[in-house]
């Protein structure tokens, strides 16, 4: 462990997780350099363009024994991505958008669910999310969904891993500071699924959360785990009112 990293760890370990005031919230877009911003702004030749085209094709393609496409049931999905994760009364649990689309695929199209984090599901999610781009995030909190919000908030503030760090210590208390030469963002999930230059591909919010857990040397959950959905729900609520950027680009 280098001296610089050790000192940084001491600073982060001592920091308290004070929530960011609503007026001071900033999208990760604002922490990026000019060239990376230009990639996100270019929807025609930007790095996410191919996933959007694949998503549109999947949306229109008939699938399953029902021989139906998403387009056969839904004229458009404007505003939908801005409302997820959402509570499903029939299943008595929170669902994120990928889970909801897979349920529709299985129950309505009579087709196999798409694998979580697969190119197909990421493409479809990006295409659906793109229709809400520029719209404010509107997460509904009800009596039945509040326990999931509280669980997500607790996870965000809980120290974990061998480094004994919480999400809040980085993204509430130390945002804007530099870690290994990179500005620490506020961790608002305004652009998922997004194209990450580090990955050279699209990825979901859960992929990013797994990366963070591995970074603090904690054991990551499996994709689709309830713990991730609760944290997603809290993070989207934390970003309420901010504009959706899907599909975003990040370093």
Where are these regions (language model features)?
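N-terminal, post-signal-peptide region of Sec/Tat-exported proteins
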Residues: 41-74
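Substrate-binding/catalytic groove segments of enzymes
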Residues: 163-164, 176-182, 215-222, 241-243
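Post-cleavage N-terminal segment of exported redox proteins
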Residues: 2, 7, 15-51, 85, ...
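Extended amphipathic alpha-helical interaction segments
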Residues: 130-182
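Solvent-exposed, glycine/polar-rich loop segments of beta-barrel outer-membrane systems
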Residues: 184-191, 250
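Short cysteine/histidine-rich zinc-coordinating motifs and their immediately flanking basic loops
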Residues: 78-86, 179-185
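The canonical Cys-X-X-Cys-His
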Residues: 65-77, 124, 152, 163-174, ...
């Amino acid at each position: 462990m280098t001296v610089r990293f050790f000192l940084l760890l001491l600073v982060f370990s001592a920091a308290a997780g004070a929530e960011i005031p609503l007026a001071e919230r900033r999208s990760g877009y604002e922490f990026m350099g000019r060239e990376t911003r230009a990639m996100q702004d270019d929807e025609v030749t930007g790095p996410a363009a191919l996933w959007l085209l694949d998503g549109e094709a999947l949306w229109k393609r008939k699938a399953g024994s029902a021989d139906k496409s998403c387009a056969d049931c839904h004229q458009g999905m404007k505003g939908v991505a801005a409302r997820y994760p959402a509570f499903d009364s029939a299943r008595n649990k929170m669902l994120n958008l990928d889970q909801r689309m897979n349920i529709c695929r299985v129950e309505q199209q009579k087709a196999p669910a798409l694998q979580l984090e697969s190119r197909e599901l990421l493409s479809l999610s990006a295409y659906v999310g793109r229709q809400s781009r520029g719209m404010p995030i509107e997460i509904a909190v009800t009596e039945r969904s509040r326990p999931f919000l509280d669980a997500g908030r607790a996870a965000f503030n809980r120290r974990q891993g061998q480094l004994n760090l919480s999400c809040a210590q980085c993204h509430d208390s130390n945002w804007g500071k530099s870690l290994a030469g990179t500005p620490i963002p506020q961790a608002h999930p305004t652009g998922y699924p997004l194209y990450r230059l580090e990955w050279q591909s699209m990825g979901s919010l859960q992929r990013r959360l797994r990366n963070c857990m591995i970074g603090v040397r904690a054991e990551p959950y499996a994709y689709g785990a309830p713990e991730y959905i609760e944290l997603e729900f809290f993070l989207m609520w934390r970003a309420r009112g901010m504009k959706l950027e899907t599909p975003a680009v990040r370093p």
